[in-house]
UniProtKB/Swiss-Prot annotation:
Alphabetically ordered keywords of this record: NADP, Oxidoreductase, Porphyrin biosynthesis
Molecular function, one GO term: glutamyl-tRNA reductase activity
Protein name (record): Glutamyl-tRNA reductase
EC top class named in words: oxidoreductase
Length: 419
């Protein structure tokens, strides 16, 4: 087994190049088929996401540049355009890279959990296309267990590192269960869409989307089962909301102190969380002066995010140590397999010599040969055959002036004890 990882990612390549080299579902099967048709490739897995394209291979003697050339031809991208952005990892470096990727240590957002699912899907797709050999199977399964260990032993994924996620995390801290809470989302842009996804993933089913245009809001409503209202209708529905998360492009505040004060009276002063992640602000700052209204601005959330990013960097130190330990252990296992193969081949060779000479000796005895002479000849020939290769190795090491190699051979033959 000889491992090779070749790829590009968000650190080395522009989004335009990443788009060109991406393996969509329509290309993946053909790509794996072409890789496996190569006599030098024992197994392969292709990982292709918006931020990276990587090819992992178990190879035997294949030149690294041949794999790059294949990528170039397959995607019809010139080598001159591709090569400056390519990175190549071999053996333990390839093992360590895959483990870092699976753990989220090589991600654009440090510690993000989605990449593990993407690596698992890449492995499954490659296995379904019968391109995963036993060695690749072992490598990827080990990488999954390392990612699980990192998640268990560190807090690298435990803190919010996006404003949208931080808003949802804040809501979970304040309310015992957001599954029982009604959430009013003001706006229908990308940030609010991310917020809705995080809320839905945490069990929230009661969402109201308020937007200037109903068309955009209807898309979110259909995806998340939300109710749609216009911005003008917010005063009539605000009292229903336990949580308000707002992100619009409005130049003026949409939710004022008086509007919230009225809603709180209708709610009989049940607490209301308002998270304003718009710039300029959607919620008047004076709302924060009201009892039972808890207002957080984008700056409040950003400070939480910044602190969490720093915390993830601290946790990443321990995660990197785990990956280094596990990749070294896996490399040792790989080397032990190579030793097993060598031992098996050496025993096979010795047995073939023994059987050949024994057969000749038995024939001599059957023909009436002197048993003593036959046995003496057998022992001499067996000795000469078995020591021929080690003798040549000793001579070669001595002639080439390689004392270290000579010492290793002598130790292997039991001629001197290891220090």
């Amino acid at each position: 087994m000889s491992l090779l990882a070749v790829g590009i990612n968000h650190n080395t390549a522009s989004v335009e190049l990443r788009e060109k080299v991406a393996f969509g579902p329509d290309k993946l099967s053909e790509a794996l088929k072409q890789l496996n048709a190569n006599a030098h490739v024992n197994g392969s897995v292709i990982l292709s996401t918006c931020n990276r394209t990587e090819v992992y291979c178990d190879v035997k003697g294949v030149a690294k540049n041949k794999l790059i050339d294949w990528l170039s031809v397959f995607h019809q991208v010139s080598p001159e355009e591709l090569k400056p952005s390519i990175y190549i990892h071999e053996e333990q470096a390839a093992i360590k890279h895959l483990m870092r990727v699976a753990c989220g240590l090589d991600s654009l957002v440090l510690g993000e959990p989605q990449i593990l699912g993407q690596v698992k899907q890449a492995y499954t797709d490659s296995r379904d296309n019968k391109s995963v050999d036993a060695s690749m199977e072992k490598l990827f399964q080990k990488s999954f267990s390392v990612a699980k260990r990192v998640r268990t032993e560190t807090e690298i994924g435990g803190s919010a590192v996006s404003v949208a996620y931080a808003a949802c995390t804040l809501a979970k801290h304040i309310f015992e269960s957001i599954a029982e809470s009604t959430v009013l989302l003001v706006g229908a842009g990308e940030t609010i869409e991310l917020v809705a996804k995080h809320l839905s993933a945490n069990g929230c089913t009661k969402m109201i989307v308020a937007n200037r245009t109903r068309e955009r809001a209807l898309g979110l409503a259909e995806e998340f089962g939300a109710e749609v209202i216009s911005l003008n209708e917010i005063p009539d529905h605000l009292h229903r909301a336990d949580i308000v998360i707002s992100s619009t492009a409005s130049p003026l505040p949409i939710i004022g102190k008086g509007m919230v004060e009225t809603a709180l009276k209708t709610r009989k002063h049940q607490p209301m969380l308002l998270v304003d992640i718009a710039v300029p602000r959607d919620v008047e700052s004076q709302v924060g002066d009201l009892n039972d209204a808890y207002l957080y601005s984008v700056d409040d959330l950003q400070s939480i995010v910044d602190g969490n990013i720093e915390q993830r960097k601290v946790e990443a130190i321990q995660a990197e140590a785990i990956v280094s330990e596990e990749s070294a252990a896996f490399m040792s296992w790989m080397r032990s397999l190579q030793a097993v193969d060598s031992i098996r081949d050496y025993r096979k060779s010795a047995n073939e010599i023994r059987e050949e000479l024994l057969s000749k000796s038995l024939q001599s005895l059957a023909a009436g040969g002197d048993p003593e002479k036959v046995l003496l000849e057998l022992s001499n020939k067996l000795t000469n055959k078995l020591i021929h290769a080690p003798t040549r190795a000793l001579q070669s090491a001595a002639e080439q002036g390689e004392p270290a190699k000579l010492t290793v051979i002598r130790q292997s033959l039991g001629l001197e004890n290891p220090q």
